[in-house]
Regions:
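Catalytic cores of extracellular degradative/oxidative enzymes
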Residues: 1-107
Length: 107
């Protein structure tokens, strides 16, 4: 929501709005689901179906792109994005029994 608005207007308010949306995605998951401080968006847990996890990661990346280097939230956002990339790479790319990289279906 705030990403494109910030790009068009330059108002700092929209950076904070994007950061709020990214952190709200963390808070909608339990500690165990998001792997505590790693902030992983699991695609097969609760409301995070594949599409929901992808939207959460997109919002996280947008917040990271807008957050200035001297902002204290930047390190947390960067850690979470790196954890998500590592999680999904390990789960779908490195797994020898999943050569096509198919996404796990949800119930």
């Amino acid at each position: 929501m705030g990403f494109m608005a910030y790009l068009l207007s330059g108002f700092h308010y929209f950076i904070e709005e994007t950061q709020l949306l990214a952190t709200a995605n963390f808070l909608k998951n339990s500690d165990e689901t998001r792997r505590f401080s790693k902030g992983v968006f699991e695609s097969s847990a609760g409301a995070n179906i594949t599409r929901g996890a992808a939207w959460s990661i997109r919002t996280l990346a947008q917040a990271l792109a807008l957050t200035p280097d001297d902002d204290s939230l930047r390190a947390e956002l960067l850690n979470s994005l790196q954890s998500n990339v590592a999680h999904y790479h390990r789960r779908y790319v490195e797994t020898p029994n999943n050569p096509l990289g198919l996404i796990q279906p949800y119930d």
